[in-house]
Amino acid sequence: MSMFLDTAKISVQAGRGGDGMVAFRREKYVPNGGPWGGDGGKGGSVIFRVDEGLRTLMDFRYNRKFKAKSGEKGMTKGMHGRGAEDLIVFVPQGTTVRDAETGKVITDLVEHGQEVVIAKGGRGGRGNIRFATPRNPAPEIAENGEPGEERQLELELKILADVGLVGFPSVGKSTLLSVVSSAKPKIGAYHFTTIVPNLGMVRTKSGDSFAMADLPGLIEGASQGVGLGTQFLRHIERTRVILHVIDMSASEGRDPYEDYVSINNELETYNLRLMERPQIIVANKMDMPEAQENLKAFKKKLAAQYDEFDDLPMIFPISSLAHQGLDNLLEATAELLAKTDEFLLYDEADLVDEEAYYGFAETEKNFEIIRDDDATWVLSGEKLERLFVMTNMERDESIMKFARQLRGMGVDEALRERGAKDGDLVRIGKFEFEFVD
C-alpha cells in the first residue's frame, strides 16, 4: 500500500478556559477582606505549523482527533489559573485547510514555519474579584471558562513544484524526471506505474534550479474520475509551468496530436485556470522509428489550430533514454519560469474571514427565537449561547447577572413581541426557566 496520502478529514478542539473562582479574603486582623477569587487560565489553541520535512498527510490517517488542554481554574488569594499550552500540529507545505461543514477555505499553508490558529482556545472565566463594586463589595459572581473552538476539517495537500509533467501513461514522464534530477520514481513498461506524485530538484548547466513533479498519467475522462481520475490533478495547481510530455513514436497506436488535445481538454475541464499556465510540449522518444515523421505531422496539425499572429507553444524534441535534447529543454524551462508569476489558488474572497470564522464579527441579530412543539420558547444564537455557558448556574448572583445580560440584549422585549406570557417556559440548550413579565 502506498505511503502517500494527500487528503484527510480530522477534528480539532481547542481547550476550554478555566472557571473563575468565588473566594473571600479571611485573615486575622483583616476585617471585611472582600472578594479574593482569581480568573481562570485561557484554554490552549490548536495551531497548524508548516514543516518542510513532511511530504504527505500520512500522519493523519490514524490520528484524526486533536484536542488542546483546558486552562486551570482560578484560585484564592486572587491568583489566576495557568493558561494551557497551545497544541502544535505539523503539516506539510502546500496543505489547504477547509471547513468540512461549509467547504470554505480557511487557510493555505505554503511557507516553511508558517503558523495559523485553526481553533482558538476559550478565555478564562473571571473570578469574583473582578465584579466588586461600591454597591456590591462582596459579589458571589464568577464566570465559567469559555468553551474552545471545535471544527471538522478537510485537509488537502497540493505539492509545491515549479514544473509539472503531464501526459498519458507510459509516455516517459518518470524516465524524464529520473534523468534530469536525483529523484528515483518507479519506472515500468505498463500503465500507471506512477501512482503517486514524485518530486525532484533540477539544476541546469547555467546554474538555475527548480522543482519538478512527475504526476500519474492522465487518460481521457480523468476529470470525471476515469483511471486515477482527479486524485492527483490537484497537484498541478501549484505549478507555474507545465511540461506536456507526448510519446512521439506512437508506440501504443495513438495519434500524438490527439493525445495532446485530449490531455488539454482534461486539464481545462478539471480547472479552467490550469490552462492559464504556459506549456512546453516535450516530444519524447525521438530515438524511436517514425518519431520524426510523427513530429512533422504533429506540428502541421498544431499550426492549423492557431491564428497566424498567435505564438505557437514551444516544442522540444528529446529522448529521455538516450539523454538527447535535455539541456535545451531545461534551459528553456528555467527561462520561462523566470518570467512567470505564481498563480494564486485562492482569492481573498475565497478565504474565510478570520473575524467571522472565530465569531468576532458583528452581526445584525445576536439571538433567534422559535416556538417549540411543546409551546416552549427556544432561544439560540452564538453570542447568547456563549454567555450562557460562561454563567455559573449554581450561583444566584451569576444567574441574576445573566438575566440582566439577556435584558440588555433585548431578549425580554423580543419575547413579549412574539407573544410570550408570564410563566411561559423559555429554553436555552437544556436549561429551562420561566418568563417573568
Curated annotation (Swiss-Prot):
One of its GO terms (molecular function) is GTP binding. One of its GO terms (biological process) is ribosome biogenesis. PROSITE patterns: G_OBG, GTP1_OBG, OBG, OCT. Mg(2+) binds at residues 174, 194. The keyword Hydrolase applies. GTP binds at residues 167-174, 192-196, 214-217, 284-287, 319-321. HAMAP family: GTPase_Obg (MF_01454). Monomer. An essential GTPase which binds GTP, GDP and possibly (p)ppGpp with moderate affinity, with high nucleotide exchange rates and a fairly low GTP hydrolysis rate. Plays a role in control of the cell cycle, stress response, ribosome biogenesis and in those bacteria that undergo differentiation, in morphogenesis control. This is GTPase Obg. It comes from Streptococcus pyogenes serotype M49 (strain NZ131).
